[in-house]
Amino acid sequence: MPLGSPEHLSVIARADANARRIADAVRDTTGGDDVLLIVASDHGHETVERIIPLETMLIEAGLKDGPDSSEVVVASNGFSAHIYVADEARDRLGGIEALLEASDDVDEIFAGDALARVGHRTDTPLAFSITAWHSDGANEFGVKGLNGAFEDPLSGETRINAGQHGGLGPYEQHPFLIVRGGGFGAGV
């Protein structure tokens, strides 16, 4: 559903009401104990502006043998994707990197030692971790953050104009955090 739409705001209101019920139940059942309640999300969302057919791009460029081949594998994470390359296809790394660099849909490319900067090991078949190009544009409901989602042939959940996550866009990097309880100083 589109971010900021009446349906979306209704879902958020129900989630807020449930969080309130839990917080009140914790408060009412502590029996005098000092409880620190923390409620958080692990990410925010941005609007899917376009779907990027990364696997198809690799196949059409001759860098992946076909949709069912396993020498080069694409794993979509929404607004980011990982590209795994088997030992027998390592000679394609330069071509894959050139394709990614030439694509207007790709923003950041992490490869080699740069993979460690984003929490990945560098001694596995993971060759590239990439993010989609994103903008500060707003959707039809005025919610900022438009992004490209990498197509996932195994899932039909990603939809144009709906919310998604998985990249490094500034608006999806704004999770919420609510803290209630004693022993936690203001501003800490």
List each language-model region with its residue ranges.
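Generic recognition of stable, solvent-exposed alpha-helical segments in well-folded globular domains
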Residues: 7-10, 14-17, 21, 48-49, ...
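A long, amphipathic alpha-helix that forms part
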Residues: 1-37, 95, 162
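Short secondary-structure boundary/capping segments
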Residues: 2-8, 52-58, 143-147
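Acidic/histidine-rich catalytic neighborhood
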Residues: 25-26, 33-86
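Active-site neighborhoods of enzymes that stabilize oxyanions during catalysis
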Residues: 70-188
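Glycine-centered flexibility sites
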Residues: 20, 43-44, 163, 181
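Short, well-ordered beta-to-alpha junction loops that form the rim of enzyme active sites
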Residues: 1, 41, 131-134
